[in-house]
Amino acid sequence: MTGTPSKLRNAALALMTLLLLLLTSCAQIPRSGPVGKSTDESAGKPNNAPVFFPVAPREGAGPESVIEDFYLAGSGYEDDYAVAREYLTQAASVAWKPDQRTLVFRSTRVVRTGVENVFNYELDVAYSVDADGIATQFPEGTKENIPVTLTQVDGQWRISAIPDGIAIPEQTFKVIYGAYPIYFYDPGFTYAVPDVRWFNKKKTVKAMTSALLSGPAPYLKGAVVSAFPSGMKLTRESVPVVSGAAQVDLSAKELVEASSEDRLRMQTQLALTFRGQPDVVNVELRANQDLVRVEDNGSVLPPVRDKNVPARQIAVNDGQLVRYENNRISPLPDIQSVGALGPVSPAESPVSQSVAFLNNSRTTLYSIVPGQPARALTTRSTLTHPSFGQQDWVWTAGPGANGATEVLAYRPTNVAEAAAMPTVTLAPAWLAGRTVKEFRVSREGVRALVISEQNGKTRVQVTGIVRNADGTPRDLTAPTTLLTDREPDQGVWVSDTTVAVMKASATDNVTPELLSLAATQPQQLAPWPGLTAISAGNGPEEIFGQSADGIFQRLGNGWSPQLKGPVDPSFPG
């Protein structure tokens, strides 16, 4: 590729980005309209949804320029990518499905192949987003080649063969796409579980509905449930919003035959999913465009979204388990002394008085319940900080007898002192060869944060917990990965979509990070010297760190001293 087309392309890219930013700052979408006003694909569109006006093919442009300009035009989604289709032959224009996949790149180049008129569009890929909005992040340097075939039509180069999908610059993606959670249920229909997707900001209501009907992302399959039966589909190509009501027209047979409870759960699931859409006030279920009545007889409780944790923390003070709350410590109610066991890393159940902790060498996991002495559950060469879920199972991870990583779960509640305790050992294939540094169950008990290491490289991942009908853990799904340039070894949940992670050090400055399922970049918190433990309550303002100088709470862009004495504070969970 010569220098001149490249310079033209860079100038066009800069102009495109400026245009997008200007449009973002000034474009206003009406929030209200006359009674009976109906919107279609624009339904639920944010006020600042941008519009990009791409450039049509230039006469006499060479093959490389046509390829580059075509992909730049892929940011222009108006009229079903009408301008981008001008770069294609008639047959290719009809066959091309731009919404099947979006590749987001950091940089690109056009590379000639050994085949005449066939080129590769080589990308340094930052993200890949599929037709259902499921995004996959890639580290810098990840390459992908898109094969492109060109031919001449009336003396002008046009693209005759190209894979479905578009490829857009990272800066453009951040402007025209947004992160939107769609919601599923835990198996007991008690909690709403977010499944964050990435959609074009102008197509959110229809896209969210289609994605919801397609089911959860791979890392949540088997861990969550949907009120919508498999195979249920939209029967219209749009989801119009009329006077604030999103009209969702579904397969008539399945909808009419569903129980009143299931229909209410369908409506609730959609309402949760649309909660961030400014044009949507309520949801109507329809069959053949006729309104289907949804009755609420009080038998179905609304699910809890973004489950809160109690304000108290459990900690260790002078070798004993204590409660830490409002910057004060008090004895842990009804729990016998465990000072002889050297407790560290304590955890408290969010739903009972069960407690777990490790011994000082972090090799033995203990549980203790009111009225009973502490009970050793397992001994390994090393174990992770215990973590409880809503189902009252306590989790840890460590090497098994053959050295391979195992994830362990125990249920100490309502077990007599001499009785066998329910126990599960899992060895998911995706953890083979890895050492787990942290395993923390999410507040609704459906997912887990897993930090693992192999050959000095760390991964921060979220997995789904698959359970039997009685709630017993059965498997951990292949996870989704949250990218960070650092090598954290500790992490905690901050909300239902965000975790805080850090690499502990008693001697160096430590910079915790917030990693979110709904963000493309980590958010670094203020550094603090010697942080060795981290805990989090409800939201980023309730993050606590511990160093040799005491406990500190995040305050704005800094840390506020709290109390010196207690160590290893941890919120229930």
UniProtKB/Swiss-Prot annotation:
Keyword Lipoprotein on entry: yes
A Pfam family matched by this chain, by name?
A: Gmad1
- Record keyword Membrane present: yes
Q: Tell me which residues bear the S-diacylglycerol cysteine lipid modification.
A: 26
Q: How does it sit in the membrane?
A: Lipid-anchor
Q: Which InterPro entries match?
A: GerMN, Lipoprotein_LpqB, Lipoprotein_LpqB_C
Annotated lipid attachment (N-palmitoyl cysteine): 26
Record's keyword terms, sorted:
Cell membrane, Lipoprotein, Membrane, Palmitate, Signal
Signal peptide positions on this chain:
1-25
GO CC terms: plasma membrane
Compartments in which it is found: Cell membrane
Please state which protein family the record places this protein in.
Belongs to the LpqB lipoprotein family.
Name assigned to this protein? Lipoprotein LpqB
Q: Which organism is it from?
A: Arthrobacter sp. (strain FB24)
Species lineage: Bacteria, Bacillati, Actinomycetota, Actinomycetes, Micrococcales
Q: Identify the coding gene.
A: lpqB
